[in-house]
Amino acid sequence: MQSVFEDLYSKKILEEEFGYTCFLQTLIDNRIPYKKTRIPSNMILLTEDTINTKVYFIEKGIVSLEKNKNVISFLGSNQIAGLNDYFMAEANLYTARVIETITAYEFNKEDIICSIIGMQEGWLYLYLNNRNHENVLIEKCNLMRGNGENRLKESLEQLGRYFGNEKEGVLRIPKCFTKKIIANYSNLSVRSVTHLCRKLVEAGFLAENSKSFVLLDKYGKIEPEVTTI
């Protein structure tokens, strides 16, 4: 159902005028202090149940969002970590962990909130950011309704759609999405993922002996690579 806000502002206008690119440029134009930083894999950006003071506008790379060690979602290019609430003293809901080295613009959260409060339509930046995040969570909830094989297949399709690289008729998921991470996200054991991957290879959905997860379904098959998944 379309919200009241989206009746006033079309989806296209919201994305063009209040999306990631415009939000970041507005902060820079308003001389909000920031530093551009490169953060390697396995580093923690934010810790759940801890008050955070930083916000990261991700230019490149991938971050996992975890709750009680369960992977809930992922953030990638043109997404924001650390701005899912409007209150300075609000503790983080998730732990944000870098799984593929990121390049990001790092701001103080207080500076961003104060800047937004001073804008006539500043709240729309927060609304759009949170709406996009909620859509991802809804997708995850729907994914969890299936059986193990369907959960794995749909997880791989989702990650391929958001983070994959389509080339030579196939869709290759970044190597940072290991079996362990995929298993956690799909609510499966690593052993189950290994078993189900064999079935998906036999079904022509995955490439065999690939260095990363490679989706073949609807893309056509490729020559197998040397190492196993």
Regions found by a protein language model. Name each.
Residues 1-41, 81, 85-86:
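Cyclic nucleotide-binding regulatory module and flanking cytosolic helices
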Residues 31-32, 50-52:
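Short, small/polar residue-rich loop motifs at catalytic or cofactor-binding pockets
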Residues 39-40, 44-50:
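Short phosphate-coordinating micro-motif centered on Lys-Gly-acidic
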Residues 40, 59-60, 76, 100:
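A cytosolic small-molecule/anion-sensing beta-strand core signal
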Residues 52-68, 77-79:
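Glycine- and acidic-residue-biased ligand/ion/polar-headgroup-sensing regions
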Residues 72-138:
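Cyclic-nucleotide recognition modules
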Residues 124-187:
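Polybasic "coupling" helices that flank or enter modular domains
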Residues 161-229:
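Phosphate-/nucleic-acid-contacting segments
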